[in-house]
Amino acid sequence: MDIEKFARVAHKAGVPLIVDNTFATPINCRPFDFGCDIVTHSTTKYMEGHASTVGGAIVDSGNFDWTQNDKFPGLTTPDDSYHGITYTEAFGKGAYITKAVVQLMRDLGAVQSPNEAFLLNVGLESLHLRIPRHCENAKKVAAYLKQHPAVTWVECAMLEGDRQYDLAQKYMPRGTCGVVSFGVKGGRAAATTFMDSLERHPGGRRSHLLPAPGIYHPSPADGRTVGGLRRAPGSGAPERRH
């Protein structure tokens, strides 16, 4: 998406822009540089990198003024469950992330175990090495699929001519991620046959595949991509067969 454009619209409306940067990771995309206020990550994917933990992260830029309007009473009025504190008065622009830690994490229990946090830290050490390889492999796979007679369409923003190519060059010039979307001839039945021969789960070291109906199952049937697949090439050889 055009981050700067969305940031202008959000700020004009008096709300923060929150960007899910899971697939691009901070290696490829730095949303704060383009006006984003808060970034989220599913660390289960590329950050951890080995499909061994479940986790997430919220990163607050500290740039958004939560007191500019009355849209955030949870931050601008006293919290009776936490000593009657008013987060904006006590923490200023850090009110959002502080509330997330001291109240929401407490109430929801969304805290990693020490071992999972350790595994995440281990995975982060190789993130800068893994991401370029994922992107390189994804680009090769996408180029191959575009020429394959059984493939009807391919979406990969790293390929010239892709509808998102210009935006990708603006926000992620070093690469987007290891995810490639494509459709196969024969519709859902053909996609299922192809998918069933592969391992499935995105964002790890290994190559995986997910079907569009599985990703968008709650959506209306006419809103799903028939025969669409999303492949996430791993860090191994791009021509590897499964």
Residue ranges and their predicted role:
Residues 131, 146, 150-236:
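Conserved C-terminal alpha-helix-loop-beta "cap" of PLP-dependent enzymes
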Residues 1-147, 155:
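Conserved PLP-enzyme active-site core in the AAT-like
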